[in-house]
Amino acid sequence: MKTKTKKAIKQTFVIAAVLVSVFIIVSFLALERPDSHQFEVSRTLISEQVWEYKPTVEKYAKQYGVTKYVDVMLAMMMQESGGRGNDPMQSSESYCGERGCIDEPELSIKQGVYYFSQTIKQANGDLKVAIQSYNFGKGFIDYINDNSGTYTQEAAINFSQKMYNTSSNKSIYTCLREEAKQYNACYGDIYYVRDVMEYRDELAKE
């Protein structure tokens, strides 16, 4: 009996030691997991395609003197296309006056960076005006200068309403957002600045 009892106690001790070890390992992994998960969420908010284009954006940012805005332009790419397609910066209209004329990503990025360099210059360094002008066109800069003097959400909505209401062919526009319909502001994206700035802030964490 004594031998069996000692053997049973020994087995119990071994099992307990194994369970304690497993518990410690699982607890350690649980503590580590949140940080890893946060990193994964952070990375997936910005698509891998956008990250892959970063060297190209940096190259043309240097060429056009806007290197400090690389994160902004990557954020704009994320908003425009998520980095997908042959025109990731959606630069065709500023390049040739119509959609779909660019079918080469590098040309899209070159034109997009160049166009942004022009908007930031004409906006006298007002970043939000420059960003919204990338979406609305440079006419938004003149509108701001004649009205509010700086970017506001209200100014973006009013400009979109004006351009949509005075258009001779409204069929070419679609409200990108449900919330824009209530304002009848279907020209461009009235919340472009808000979303681009959110992407930029996410990029800045990396």
Give residue ranges: language-model regions.
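Non-catalytic cell-wall polysaccharide-engagement segments
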Residues: 2-51, 63-64, 99-107, 118-206
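Short, solvent-exposed loop/turn and secondary-structure capping segments
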Residues: 86-89, 144-145
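Short, functionally critical alpha-helical segments immediately adjacent to catalytic or ligand/cofactor-binding
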Residues: 67-84, 91, 109-113, 130-137, ...
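Peri-catalytic and regulatory segments of divalent metal-dependent proteins
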Residues: 53, 57
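Extracytoplasmic/periplasm-facing segments of secreted or lipoprotein envelope proteins
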Residues: 58-66
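Short linear capping/connector segments at secondary-structure termini
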Residues: 89-97
